Amino acid sequence: MSADLCEQIADMRRKLQRCRTTHVMFLDETALRLSEAPTHTIVLPGEQAYVMATETSSYSKRYDMIACCVGDRVLLPKIFTPTERKDADVKGINRAMLLQFVDDVLAQAVEGLDRYPLTLVLDRASIHKNLDALRQAFHDRSSESIKDILLMPPNAAKRMSPLDNAMFHDWKEKCRLLCPATAKTIQRIMSDAWTKMKPKPHYKHCGLTHNTDVYFDCPAPTVHQHGN
């Protein structure tokens, strides 16, 4: 990782540290892959039991999820089934689905927080880059709480995003503990596991809390010589 990227991460951390973590929101997408349970389980007649898949082949069913958090809580996610993706003729979550999530779920959830101003932080996935469309989606639902929408520096999510470091990993482990599942229960399992997540320690791990050294996780401090 270059010294320049470390400086970009540090600059954004300084900006976000000036906000309360309860006013900094992260949004991202993840997925859970399921395969048929390898052992016999108790399910209703005609139902197939599933467990989290270790492979990524076409034989595993993928459930996509859009999720958000602020420093003290997670917000209601949106889960897309393999059938919904097939009907929409898409392989994953696209921009239209993201904007629909804002319209159906997120705008109302944001206003329910009753906090202003909020800052929304995203990685540089292609579906996130049209910031004007995102702002308009919130505006169309009379949601005015989000003042800023920021894109993280390239390849910075593992160091800056609580979702990538490492809420999504912990969430998948919670889902694994609740398997086996069926097609009727997997969305509830995914949602219930997500609502139990606690973002606060992950914000600290990402250097987003006040007075945290913005270079604390620099991979090469003696080479980069930050601040010298």
Where would I find each of the regions flagged by the language model?
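Short, aromatic/basic amphipathic alpha-helical patches
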Residues: 130-143
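Extended, low-complexity cationic-aromatic segments
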Residues: 6-107
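Short helix-terminating capping/connector loops at secondary-structure junctions
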Residues: 19-20, 113-116, 143-146
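RNase H-like polynucleotidyl transferase catalytic core
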Residues: 48-57, 140-162, 179
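Acidic/histidine-rich, metal-coordinating catalytic segments
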Residues: 28, 102, 113-130, 152-161
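C-terminal anion-handling pockets and recognition modules
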Residues: 20-24, 31, 156-157, 163-228
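Short catalytic/ligand-binding loop motif for oxyanion handling, primarily in non-cytosolic enzymes
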Residues: 33-36, 75-76, 127-131, 157-162, ...
